[in-house]
Amino acid sequence: MRFIEEFINKGYFHQCTDLDRLTAITKETKIAAYIGFDCTATSLHIGSLMQIMILRLLQQHGHKPIVIIGGGTSKIGDPTWKDEVRKILSKEDIAKNAEGIKKSLSKFIKFGDGKSDAIMLDNAEWLDSFNYLDFLRDFGSYFSVNRMLTMDSVKLRLEREQHLSFLEFNYMLLQAYDFYYLSKHYNCSLQLGGSDQWGNIVMGADLIRKISGKEVFGMTTPLLTTSSGAKMGKTAAGAVWLNEDLLSPYDYYQYWRNCEDADIVRFAKLYSEFTQEELNRFESLAAEDINAAKKQLAYELTKLCHSEQAAKSALETAVKIFEEGQIDENLPTVVLEQEVLQAGISAYELFHEAGLATSKSEARKLIRGNGAKINDRLVADENMIINTNFLLDKKVIKLSAGKKRHILVRV
């Protein structure tokens, strides 16, 4: 199966500047294509997983993936579909975040000097040295303000009478220049991104065409939500991070294990590397087979992101907890100072400290709703004092929020 065919078959396709021509070119030759990522955290989360799998697919078909870290543009902020001005990051924050993002990406693609090896670039390399007057002189005449005002991302802010600074308005010019720079210096002929980036991508392709006459393309992916309408990458407990220092492989496994029934087939197509035969089986699941399919999906996605050993460990932990009722040492762990436990801490405070509730009031609500357990026993009193007497084997306390979120408290 060719790149574009598989791209469409997996559900990645939304829009392309010239799909027929791009299909023909990618059949005949290998291209360089780029995707940009925000540099706003020390890890990517599953909201970026489709873009990451596209980079992986490019590489598998012999094309060269280029990853752009927006070290330059992160200093400004992208107004695309944002209701508020974004926090501007320091150089130190950007450098730390870029390191973590490369760690996320390296789980899925190979970086190096080979023809199809990925490279990662920071657009600060060319944007930081920009002379504003030179930019206006050399590129300003190629951009139409009339057209920029028609971009949906800008129109949204204006229609809501929300503040749109000149700083943010310039973002689309800089993204267009990124594409031009990569086309000129890295022979990049394709920019990929979410459908909310369509306007910015087209502006870049137009800029290249006007200046150099090169044939380049833009292609976008659909914006994904779960079947219930929730945004991919976010849960009530926080983001589903790819790096294990922010989210344990067990919690990553549990996210996919607990996905909604209606999402199983779509997630399998988008995020796994199951064969077509396996995908066909997913599409014809009987009701009694859904749980087994979720386990298989969670295992495969955890293996892909972390390792086969991590997937096995997560599966074993889940079996011990949910099927055998045991405590497993591989559960996510938080450390509590021994002095705190010796003095005693109220149940609601402990659940908040352990991260099973985002606030103390939420912890109280959890306990009042009979959703909290300590060492598998229901917590009836939110003010109950938890001390060293609750330690199992003098080592840990098991906390549970609902049926699927568990954590060990160690001292």
UniProtKB/Swiss-Prot annotation:
Q: Which residues bind ATP?
A: 234
Q: Mind telling me which Gene3D superfamilies this protein's record contains?
A: HUPs (3.40.50.620), RNA-binding S4 domain (3.10.290.10), Tyrosyl-Transfer RNA Synthetase (1.10.240.10)
Keyword Acetylation (UniProt): no
The subcellular location is: Cytoplasm
Do the record's keywords include Transcription? no
Q: Report the GO molecular function annotations.
A: ATP binding; RNA binding; tyrosine-tRNA ligase activity
| EC number(s) reported in the record | 6.1.1.1
Major place of localization?
Answer: cytoplasm
Per the Swiss-Prot or TrEMBL record, what residue ranges does the short sequence motif 'HIGH' region cover?
39-48
InterPro entries found in the cross-reference section? aa-tRNA-synth_Ic (IPR002305), Rossmann-like_a/b/a_fold (IPR014729), S4_RNA-bd_sf (IPR036986), SYY-like_C (IPR054608), Tyr-tRNA-ligase (IPR002307), Tyr-tRNA-ligase_bac-type (IPR024088), Tyr-tRNA-ligase_bac_1 (IPR024107)
Q: Which UniProt keywords apply?
A: Aminoacyl-tRNA synthetase, ATP-binding, Cytoplasm, Ligase, Nucleotide-binding, Protein biosynthesis, RNA-binding
Motif 'KMSKS' region, per the record, lies over 231-235
Q: Which HAMAP family match?
A: Tyr_tRNA_synth_type1
How is the quaternary structure described?
Homodimer.
Task: Write out the similarity annotation.
Answer: Belongs to the class-I aminoacyl-tRNA synthetase family. TyrS type 1 subfamily.
Q: What does this protein do?
A: Catalyzes the attachment of tyrosine to tRNA(Tyr) in a two-step reaction: tyrosine is first activated by ATP to form Tyr-AMP and then transferred to the acceptor end of tRNA(Tyr).
Q: What is this protein called?
A: Tyrosine--tRNA ligase
